[in-house]
């Protein structure tokens, strides 16, 4: 297979546009999110090298990927889903080894992540990671925390999200979720 240079650059452009639209929708009062958005925009505006040695890999949860892509209805997110579809055979889906002894084995049949832009992504960037988290039906991603701040956009389906010890709240396609470093969070797919 030929390396998907054009598709990767289109994905980068679509993600950059998503983050630029975010920049205008949050106030400076939301300092940590605003700083996160600024860092991602700055990094994506740089020329990034292709990771020619990148090796594709699939996980059991990838059985849901085509459905997730086809169910993306939001016009802005549809562009991202279309580029994901064009890249899907090049993606290196992984399991988080940090949770191997924490979560049940069945969890790993219904969860995986892929880094598209980042230190080991299709496009190399040392200071940010842009990728996908794929969860199957009826999956509880237990409460956890980590050093990385994260920004999620729901592409398809729905999910219940919990931040700290608050209630789970329904998130639908197009909804955006941000949590800062070490903020405890959990999700449960419907």
Locations of regions flagged by a protein language model:
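Residues that recognize and position ribonucleotide moieties
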Residues: 126-128, 152
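A short, N-terminal "cap"/entry segment at the start of jelly-roll beta-barrel domains
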Residues: 8, 13-125
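Short acidic-glycine-tyrosine-enriched beta hairpin
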Residues: 151, 164-186
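Asparagine-centered strand-capping/turn motif at beta-strand->loop junctions
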Residues: 188-190
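Extended repeat-based interaction scaffolds and adjacent low-complexity, acidic/S/T/P-biased segments
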Residues: 1-2, 6
């Amino acid at each position: 297979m030929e390396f998907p240079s054009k598709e990767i650059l289109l994905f980068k452009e679509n993600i950059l546009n998503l983050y630029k639209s975010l920049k205008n929708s949050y106030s400076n009062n939301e300092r940590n999110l605003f700083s996160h958005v600024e860092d991602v925009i700055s990094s994506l505006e740089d020329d990034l090298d292709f990771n020619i040695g990148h090796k594709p890999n699939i996980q059991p949860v990838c059985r849901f990927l085509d459905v997730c892509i086809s169910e993306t209805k939001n016009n802005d997110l549809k562009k991202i889903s279309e580029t994901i579809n064009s890249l899907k055979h090049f993606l290196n889906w992984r399991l988080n080894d940090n949770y191997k002894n924490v979560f049940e084995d069945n969890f790993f049949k219904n969860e995986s992540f892929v880094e598209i832009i980042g230190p080991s992504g299709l496009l190399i960037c040392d200071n940010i990671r842009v990728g996908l988290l794929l969860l199957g039906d009826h999956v509880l991603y237990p409460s956890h925390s980590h050093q990385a701040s994260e920004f999620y956009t729901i592409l398809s389906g729905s999910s219940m999200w919990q931040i700290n010890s608050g209630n789970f709240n329904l998130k639908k396609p197009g909804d955006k979720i941000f949590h800062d470093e070490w903020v405890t969070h959990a999700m449960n797919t419907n």
